[in-house]
Swiss-Prot record:
Encoding gene (name): GAP1
Species annotation: Giardia intestinalis
UniProt site (Activates thiol group during catalysis): H179
Database matches in NCBIfam families: GAPDH-I
Protein's name according to its UniProt entry: Glyceraldehyde-3-phosphate dehydrogenase 1
MF terms (GO), sorted A to Z: glyceraldehyde-3-phosphate dehydrogenase (NAD+) (phosphorylating) activity; NAD binding; NADP binding
């Protein structure tokens, strides 16, 4: 029996999670909750996508459901997580994709509606964070009802940092993510009390921004806790971002040795999560890529044997959503009683 998934919030990540689930064996989306979108519009938004292209499959809708590739998906319209009737469709795991309910207290309200586990598609202040390939072995099904899939940037940075740290040791590091625009940004200048620069036009500016992605690596990989921090630049591209990790190593190494170790990891324990390329790639070459850390050996540089800059690309929409569903599959495999 497949793991039965519910999606709360049919925005960018919610829709990408549904698309991703269709290519991952052992999972099935059976319910979606979005109080702001009717079924006809859901069909339209899933069918047409400016970034990832037209949906390659069949979609239909009724008053209270959409049918994707012959599979009927119930649609609910509740504003409050505790009122969503997940139990009606025997949902095992809810993917919390609204960006609103990111604490354990808020996210676990879904369990009141009848689901058994919740995975938050964003960083969380208090829920345990997991990154595929890095720390799934620490998941405890008996105590962890609500977990987080961390951020798209952490899903790129953590595998890269883990491989380098295991072999060469990371003494300290700074990360910069050059990040695609997201739905929270504004197309023209507007008010943004929390972040004045964030209120400037996303289509006409490179915008410096804060990010907790590097610090979050320390929660996923305790050996790196306190050793990494970072910032972001938001740039006018619709999807695909890139991480620049500049770090001081504990051991001497050549750039070729570091690249060789990353390549080894991409072909072994991180296969499907990390890839390695030595070609002259640009951001659009990684659109709809399912791996979340795509190392670019030609883009990195080294100053000396202990100071290096490493570069990795990631599809911050589809790649992240793919690992969100993969995490749900893993959680389901450990039991959802």
């Amino acid at each position: 029996m497949p793991i039965r998934l519910g999606i709360n919030g049919f925005g960018r990540i919610g829709r990408m999670a549904l698309r991703a689930s269709l290519n991952i064996d052992g999972v099935q989306v059976v319910a979606i909750n979005d109080p702001f979108t009717d079924c006809e519009y859901m069909e339209y938004m899933l069918k047409y996508d400016t970034v990832h292209g037209r949906f390659d499959g069949t979609i239909a809708h009724s008053e209270d459901s959409i049918t994707v590739n012959g599979n009927k998906i119930s649609v609910f319209k509740s504003m409050k997580p505790e009122e969503i009737p997940w139990g009606k469709t025997q949902v095992d795991i809810v993917l919390e994709c609204t960006g609103r309910f990111t604490t354990k207290k808020d996210a676990e309200l879904h369990i009141t509606g009848g689901c058994k586990r919740v995975i938050i598609s964003a960083p969380s202040a208090d829920a345990p964070m997991f990154v595929c390939g890095c720390n799934l072995e620490t998941y405890d099904p008996s105590t962890m009802k609500v977990i987080s899939n961390a951020s798209c940037t952490t899903n790129c940075l953590a595998p890269l940092a883990m491989v380098v740290n295991k072999k060469f040791g990371i003494k300290e590091g700074l990360m910069t993510t050059v990040h695609a625009v997201t739905a929270t940004q504004l197309p023209v200048d507007g008010p943004s009390k929390k972040d004045w620069r964030g209120g400037r036009s996303c289509g006409a500016n490179v915008i410096p921004s804060s990010t907790g992605a590097a610090k979050a690596v320390g929660k996923v990989l305790p050996a790196l806790n306190g050793k990494l921090t970072g910032m972001a630049f938001r740039v006018p591209v619709p999807d695909v971002s890139v991480v620049d990790l500049t770090c001081t190593l504990e051991k001497d190494a050549t750039y070729d040795e570091i690249c060789a170790e990353i390549k080894r990891g991409s072909e072994n324990e991180l296969k499907g999560i990390m890839t390695y390329t030595n070609e002259d790639v640009v951001s659009s070459d990684f659109l709809s890529t399912t791996s979340t850390c795509n190392f670019d050996s030609k883009a990195g540089i080294m100053l000396n044997s202990r100071f290096v800059k490493l570069v990795a690309w990631y599809d911050n929409e589809f790649g992240y959503a793919n690992k969100l569903v993969e995490l749900a599959k893993y959680v389901g495999s450990k039991g959802c009683q």
